[in-house]
Amino acid sequence: MPVPRLSPFAALRHRNFRLFYTGQTISLTGTWMQQLAQGWLVLQLTDSALWVGLVAALGSLPILVFSLPAGVYADRANKRRVVTVCQALLLAAAALLAVLVATGRVAAWQVAVLAAVVGTVNAFEIPARQSFIVELVGKEDLTNAIALNSSAFNATRIVGPAVAGLLVAEVGIAACFGINALSYVAVLIALQAMRLPPWQRPTAAGGGLDQVREGLRFVRRDPRVLALVLNTAVLSLFGFPYIVLLPVFARDVLRVGAQGLGVMSASIGIGALAAALGLAAFSPHVRRGMLVAWASPVFGLAVAGFAYARWFPLAIATLALTGFAMVLNNAATNTLLQTLVPDGLRGRVMALWALVFVGFAPLGSLLTGWLAGGVGAPAALAAGGALATVVSVWMWGRHAPQVAKLR
């Protein structure tokens, strides 16, 4: 019996999406485990907040370089093949890091190099995967599919860090990297099990540079799309680095250790999951433009509040609020962009969104890590959260009439 369209699980009626969703959920659990373990490993190896920020930055900086050409490639290429190759490369990188840690030969520079490799792969994987979803469910269920993906992303954000915190404390960091490597197998199996129509190479108008310019022109000329992209850039640059500094807060500010770090990361996931499930359930009745306009400054305020929380339960509550606001903003922005953009430009526009969403974060991480070394992690983070709030309020004061009415 078909799933009703207004069901919060409507997109799961599509077999290919069910496969993709299952594989991604398993893989994301491993990804979150590795993210926590990697930050803790770098802090152990270097005892430096700047190094923690640097490695996080190297994991995202390649997206600044490669995202736009990767978006052109995503519009031209077989997206399933691109995602498959990228997932296999990510598996290899995680396995190598697991071996280095298990054998005691790991050094900070090796972690940094592998982070850069992963970032380069992600530059091609993200736009291909984002634009692949619409091929699995069609535009009718796209909003629901994005909300469900966000639910999986954030449910695993609860489980992954919590398990990683226990493993780091009781077994060792290498186990987290090994489990992440194995988790990519689930995605590879799901991709091969899909039943898709034969792929046909699209006819490309102009060279690669011309197609990049075409995508940028579209964004510049549509004030709604431009506002959504600029808002993402502001939050990514000034707000998102709070995640990078969680190991520093866990060890040096709140003094709760690796297990406390797992709880902190999981609390972000709890707030984010609540937002994603709410969006999936009520998506037909929500003005996504209004969600973005309100969630953005709330996120900045929550980051600033966490920076000065010294009571652990209060820190957990503010982190949950950051997760809640962040997912409302990101999921609504993602859906609006994919709805507003023509099919032939979707890969390029989503690549630009990935560039500012993921690629600007390392610049913010470097800046925040540098400031943390001078004025301390709390002051650095509070400044970023406050700046994100002020700029976001100013931006939506100008663009709210155009964006708030979007559904």
Please give the residue ranges for each predicted region.
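Alpha-helical transmembrane-bundle signature of multi-pass membrane transport and export proteins
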Residues: 1-407
